[in-house]
Amino acid sequence: MTRRNNPELNDEREPIDKIKASIDLKKKTIRRNKRKRRLIKMLQFLIVIGVLIGIYYFDKSDASRVHNVRVNGNVILSDAEIKDALNIHENQRIYLTFKPFINHKGKKVKGIDNIDANVYYRQGIINLNVTEKKAVGYTLEPSIRIYFEDGFYKELETLNPSVIERLPLLVGFTEESISESLLSALATIDDGSMASVSEIHFEPTKVEPDYMRIVMNNDYFVFTNVETLPQLNKYATIISGADSNARCIEFIEYGPTEETQSAVVKACGS
């Protein structure tokens, strides 16, 4: 006999089968998503490991290092002094070296006015274009020192004629008398007038504790204090109309401005 399906039972099983199929599909989807997430995490982990390994080997390679530091424009400060002040040396990691940081740090170095750095990462080269502060004088005693306008000085073991050829020799000064105001006043003197100065002797008096006698290289003498020292910029004009026998020039101050200052040219000893 042929067995007949009960339509009512079939109708009851259909929703159950659909629910079961839906549950199975969801389980498969969840398992598939889990596998996908695990795969993505594994790929991310491998990428991170690969990047770290790449960074490690790059850091160990010559390509990551500074091969050459070139210092240009410095006259008095040595290459080594500038490198040490900036903490930049060969064989350092060049990818940790940035131009803005070098330029900013350079402004804080004594004796340096400005640094314009260029970093060539592929070649491993750092160029330091240096502008020094203006040098305004030098001493021989108690030691050889070159003084800059910002108050910084550099000591030298031996005298370099090319460095001091246009600088005045400071004679009789103590560390206290080489004040910031003196160095600032010397910095205002133009190069042409400064080149005419041979020596500056510190000869204080009771009335003027910062009095100086300046020996010019054309047999003239200038007497001044710190306040009137900038009048030396008018030196060429002053002597152009002076009597050839009048070799002593005294800067006189009537007030705090250049308009209230004057120069008297007279025979020495008069």
Curated annotation (Swiss-Prot):
Alphabetized Gene3D superfamilies for the sequence: 3.40.50.10960
This protein's GO CC annotations: cell division site; plasma membrane
Biological process terms in GO annotation: FtsZ-dependent cytokinesis
Domain of life: Bacteria
Transmembrane feature ranges: 39-59
Stretches assigned to the Extracellular side: 60-270
Chain ranges of the POTRA domain: 64-135
Membrane topology recorded in Swiss-Prot or TrEMBL: Single-pass type II membrane protein
Localization in the cell: Cell membrane
Cytoplasmic side: 1-38
Keywords: Cell cycle, Cell division, Cell membrane, Membrane, Transmembrane, Transmembrane helix
Major location (coarse): membrane
Covalent S-S links between cysteines: none
Similarity-based family: Belongs to the FtsQ/DivIB family. DivIB subfamily.
Function noted in UniProt: Cell division protein that may be involved in stabilizing or promoting the assembly of the division complex.
Protein name: Cell division protein DivIB
Source species: Erysipelothrix rhusiopathiae (strain Fujisawa)
Lineage: Bacteria, Bacillati, Bacillota, Erysipelotrichia, Erysipelotrichales
